[in-house]
Amino acid sequence: MTIALGKFTKDESDLFDIMDDWLRRDRFVFVGWSGLLLFPCAYFALGGWFTGTTFVTSWYTHGLASSYLEGCNFLTAAVSTPANSLAHSLLLLWGPEAQGDFTRWCQLGGLWTFVALHGAFGLIGFMLRQFELARSVQLRPYNAIAFSAPIAVFVSVFLIYPLGQSGWFFAPSFGVAAIFRFILFFQGFHNWTLNPFHMMGVAGVLGAALLCAIHGATVENTLFEDGDGANTFRAFNPTQAEETYSMVTANRFWSQIFGVAFSNKRWLHFFMLFVPVTGLWMSALGVVGLALNLRAYDFVSQEIRAAEDPEFETFYTKNILLNEGIRAWMAAQDQPHENLIFPEEVLPRGNAL
């Protein structure tokens, strides 16, 4: 039996190989296969947002001015969500709502679904870009894993939450003041600050900020100096063989401060990765729960006692009254189509009034 050994040669004109060679070529800005998703989606999402905040009104969906053309500034302009009556329609330009009319499409809130969907796929493309480039240079994929956390938050807040409610109307509009209003809405209708998933998210974000500050300061404090000159730190040389800072000195310092300290760099940096990523993932899970109208902590016994005893009130019961006030004022403003009217006697009043 004869066995022929040799290199298997593919057709040189193979389209996949040609594209792969061009897309993954070493250039100033890496493109890659992920770039086919990232660059068009990011371009359309940003372009839609700039177009909406510059020219498009929210009069037909929210009864608001929301563009620079109407007198808004950077903090008050927004690309607003579609009207509640449009439910979960994708609002395609060629769909039954706009019927190819670009002006009508903008008036109906079509730019919001356009920006939200292209933005979500653009973020996913950016995560895939990190994964693809890491494989190309033989790195671990932890950058991509870390970036999955803000993607989870974006998808849960802008897509999953309104999908669980009656329509895109209840998602945040794309603007600074608009998102502040959405946060107030979350507090009033879901008591979000008392939700344990929100607490984990806050602990993750603030804990990560603390870890970054401590880590940066510690590294600066323990840099190996390489002479007396102002610019003679060999740490600026990317090919240095020696360490940049003294882990041993840092370990001794924090051992004296706290009594405990990280003993190796792997555990230290994994912890710095773990804290914010886990916090953001937990908050994303919490928002998915809110999409299903799951409730946070309820201390009903305190509410009952506060209702019966005029002299008893806690910070919790005061916050519950605040939430009722937010709901009473916000519902009538945000949902004028519901014709909600709250007489004076049903508006919340604290025991102090």
From Swiss-Prot:
One of its GO terms (cellular component) is chloroplast thylakoid membrane. GO terms for biological process: photosynthetic electron transport in photosystem II. Chlorophyll a PD2 binds at residue 198. The chain crosses the membrane at residues 41-61, 125-141, 153-166, 208-228, 279-295. Fe cation binds at residues 215, 269. The D1/D2 heterodimer binds P680, chlorophylls that are the primary electron donor of PSII, and subsequent electron acceptors. It shares a non-heme iron and each subunit binds pheophytin, quinone, additional chlorophylls, carotenoids and lipids. There is also a Cl(-1) ion associated with D1 and D2, which is required for oxygen evolution. The PSII complex binds additional chlorophylls, carotenoids and specific lipids. InterPro entries: D1/D2 (IPR055266), Photo_II_D1/D2_sf (IPR036854), Photo_RC_L/M (IPR000484), Photo_RC_L/M_CS (IPR055265), PSII_PsbD/D2 (IPR005868). It is found in: Plastid, Chloroplast thylakoid membrane. A plastoquinone binds at residues 215, 262. Coiled coil: none annotated. The keyword Cell membrane does not apply. It is an enzyme of class 1 (oxidoreductase). It catalyses: 2 a plastoquinone + 4 hnu + 2 H2O = 2 a plastoquinol + O2. CDD domains: Photosystem-II_D2 (cd09288). Photosystem II (PSII) is a light-driven water:plastoquinone oxidoreductase that uses light energy to abstract electrons from H(2)O, generating O(2) and a proton gradient subsequently used for ATP formation. It consists of a core antenna complex that captures photons, and an electron transfer chain that converts photonic excitation into a charge separation. The D1/D2 (PsbA/PsbD) reaction center heterodimer binds P680, the primary electron donor of PSII as well as several subsequent electron acceptors. D2 is needed for assembly of a stable PSII complex. This is Photosystem II D2 protein. It comes from Vitis vinifera.
